[in-house]
Regions:
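Cofactor-binding loop segments of dinucleotide-utilizing enzymes, especially the Rossmann-like FAD-
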Residues: 4-5, 33, 103-105
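Hydrophobic alpha-helical segments, chiefly the membrane-spanning helices
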Residues: 203-205
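Conserved small/polar residues in nucleotide/adenosyl-binding loops
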Residues: 192-199
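N-terminal small/polar loop signature for handling phosphorylated ligands or for N-terminal nucleophile
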Residues: 9-81, 198
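Generic structural signal for well-ordered, non-membrane alpha-helical segments
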Residues: 10, 14, 39-43, 51, ...
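Conserved beta-strand elements of the Class I
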Residues: 1-2, 57-59, 101
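A glycine/threonine-rich phosphate-anchoring loop and its flanking beta-alpha core
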Residues: 78-177, 181
Length: 205
């Protein structure tokens, strides 16, 4: 099952991915209801959809919200209960029986490399975090060609996301001698590459 947003689906960005899955002898299904901040209603719908289609693998295709939605769905397929109870620690995480692949289409969230997810309870206006060794993707595929579909301003915005994470890591109270040089290096790399989309956008004006 591929998890993505409606815009990604409507633009046909999944076509080559779906063709690749079919060429491997698999029949893909698509849950294209991913929304910003991964609302719990969307996650619940995705869980139901995945169970109805008896999926054995999930592919997250999109930005951080699609990643978080896919992570939450993957974690909940083998347990009974609700995603909010899972986030609150009322449901014990267990090793997933399904495979989780992550293909990011932005360059800033880093969600494809972490075992942490965030979902939004819009009714309570509260974001829940879930984090455990089974929440992270089994495989992450980074294809720079996918970034060509983004506008320079969107690339810059998502790169600023990466810069912000690095700045937080450097300035937080838990920073240590191992973390600080890595955070500084990450900020330097982010700053260097932020200039490229900015210059490209200026040249188009």
């Amino acid at each position: 099952m591929v998890v993505c947003g409606n815009k990604t689906y409507s633009l046909g960005l999944l076509n080559s991915l779906l063709d690749s899955i079919r060429s491997g002898g698999f029949t893909p299904c698509v849950f294209h209801g991913s929304l910003p901040d991964a609302p719990v209603e969307t996650v619940r719908s995705g869980i139901t959809y995945a169970k109805e289609h008896d999926v054995s693998a999930i592919v997250a295709f999109g930005g951080g919200s699609a990643m978080d939605t896919a992570k939450a769905i993957a974690c909940m397929l083998d347990v009974d209960g609700d995603i909010i109870a899972y986030c609150k620690g009322q449901i014990k995480p267990i090793r997933r029986s399904n495979l989780l692949f992550a293909i990011p289409t932005t360059c800033g969230t880093g969600s494809e490399s972490t075992d942490i997810g965030v979902v939004l309870d819009r009714e309570a206006n509260y974001k829940y975090i879930f984090a455990n060794p089974f929440a992270g993707p089994d495989v992450a595929i980074l294809d720079p060609v996918l970034l060509t579909a983004l506008s320079p301003s969107m690339i810059a915005a998502t790169a600023m996301d990466a810069f912000s994470h690095s700045a937080e890591a450097y300035t937080c109270k838990a920073a240590n001698v191992m973390m600080e040089p890595l955070a500084l290096a990450s900020m330097a790399v982010s700053y260097t590459h932020l200039r490229a989309p900015r210059d490209t956008e200026r040249s188009r004006m």
